[in-house]
Every structure is written in C-alpha cells, then in structure tokens.
C-alpha cells in the first residue's frame, strides 16, 4: 500500500537576514518543500538572470546555491495571507 504524502510548504515571515533566507531555501529544497511563502520584511530572491543585485540579493544567491530555481516561491504581505493561500491550495 502506498503511503500518503503530505504537501509541504514553508512560510518565512519577518526574517531580516538574506543569508538566513537563502539557507532556508537550500534546506527546503533538500527536504522536499513544494512552495515557500515570503512575508513581512523578508527579502526576496533576485530575479532569474539578474546581473545588478543589492548586497542582500548577493548574500541570498551565495547561500541558496540555486535552490530558488527549484522551489516555487511567492510573496505575501502577511503570514495570514500565506496561510489562507496554502489552505485553499490543499496544503495540509
């Protein structure tokens, strides 16, 4: 009998350090997280192929090691909005 597998999501809310956010992306990628929600003042990854980046985006890219390309992510104003989105999308 096949085991039921839950869909995993991660909400990163009000984490100031781009280095820490990049590390969370890398860890989420390894753990099989399907989607990451970024909310509050949490920094977002740089655009794909971006050349001009802020110091925070450079720090993110250095620690994420490309995980932002393999884990879907979405920006939300609040963590509550992210929770509502994940509930509607069937994350448990």
What are these regions (language model features)?
Residues 1-92:
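RNA substrate-binding interface of SAM-dependent RNA methyltransferases
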């Amino acid at each position: 009998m096949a085991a039921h597998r839950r869909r995993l999501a991660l909400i990163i809310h009000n984490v100031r350090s781009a280095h820490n956010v990049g590390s969370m992306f890398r860890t989420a990628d390894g753990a099989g997280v399907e989607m990451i929600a970024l909310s509050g003042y949490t920094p977002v990854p740089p655009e794909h192929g971006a050349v001009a980046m802020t110091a925070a985006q450079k720090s993110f890219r250095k620690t994420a090691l490309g995980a932002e390309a393999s884990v879907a992510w979405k920006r939300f104003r609040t963590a509550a909005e992210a929770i509502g989105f994940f509930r509607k999308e069937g994350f448990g």
